[in-house]
Amino acid sequence: MIWEHRTLKRRRLRDLPPVDAVAPIDDGDPVPDRLVPLGYEKKDTAGSLGLLVGSIVVGFALDGLYRRVHGFMFRHRVSNIGSHRGSILSAMIVWDFLYYWNHRWMHEVRLFWADHVAHHSGRRYNLSTALRQTWSGVLTTWVYWPMSLLGYRYSTFLKARQLNLLYQYWIHTEAIDRLPEPIEKIFNTPSHHRVHHGANKQYIDKNYGGILIIWDRFFKTFEPEIRQVQYGLTKNIRTNNPVKMAYGEFVNIAKDVVSADNLNDRLKYVFAGPGWQPDTIRPEPAFS
């Protein structure tokens, strides 16, 4: 944190303002605290830590279920590629590819977005932002089942997941500008991930990769960091309560489903994009 503070203090402001931001700064935005590092805010950081603690508790509670599901899939594996020498490297690549699609669907399907919105809810972008982890990841664990079918053991599966999460921790910072071009071309970097957390129109639904950015380049979801990033949601939830951040969107979905006039609308409120509304031809997502 101190390193981030010193780096940000030295850095000059970017030349281009966020003229296309869709979540303009207002009186409700968090105010920096003089006694905490630059770029941090006490309530924002406390909310991030609360989400981390909840995520760890939920993870421990569901670990037995995850192991049983993996064991069943592993016994019915169609390949033993995961047992070969160097399997951890291939596991990391396979995990990252599946992570790209998992992450993308989290932004494109409202039910999955409800699982992910807490991570994007902060209007600060710093290392504590990476701690905003899901409490309902069970909704999308099926995305990674192919790894079990390919013959990756549960221990290898966990290592690939943990290394992916660890890599993504350091890219949640404004203190690192662009890295050398070869790195920016292949890997996810702080610059690329700042774009992903942006509420600017041009940054919405971009840069889903975990470790590698090549998936975004290949599937046409890549966007470079050009203008200053406006962090948060297009409609900020204005709370640092971990429970509200973790489950608030599920409550909103339930309210919309109850108020819907027909089955088709009810299903779309759950499975269409986050910003879907009845009779909307090309909806704007609530945030991606």
Locate the predicted segments by residue.
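Specific transmembrane helices
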Residues: 1-73, 84-100
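Cytosolic/stromal cytosol-facing helical appendages immediately following the last transmembrane segment
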Residues: 6-31, 37, 124-128, 170-288
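Membrane-embedded catalytic scaffold of the fatty acid hydroxylase/desaturase
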Residues: 53-54, 58-62, 81-232
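Beta-strand-enriched accessory nucleic-acid recognition/scaffold domains that flank the catalytic cores
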Residues: 76
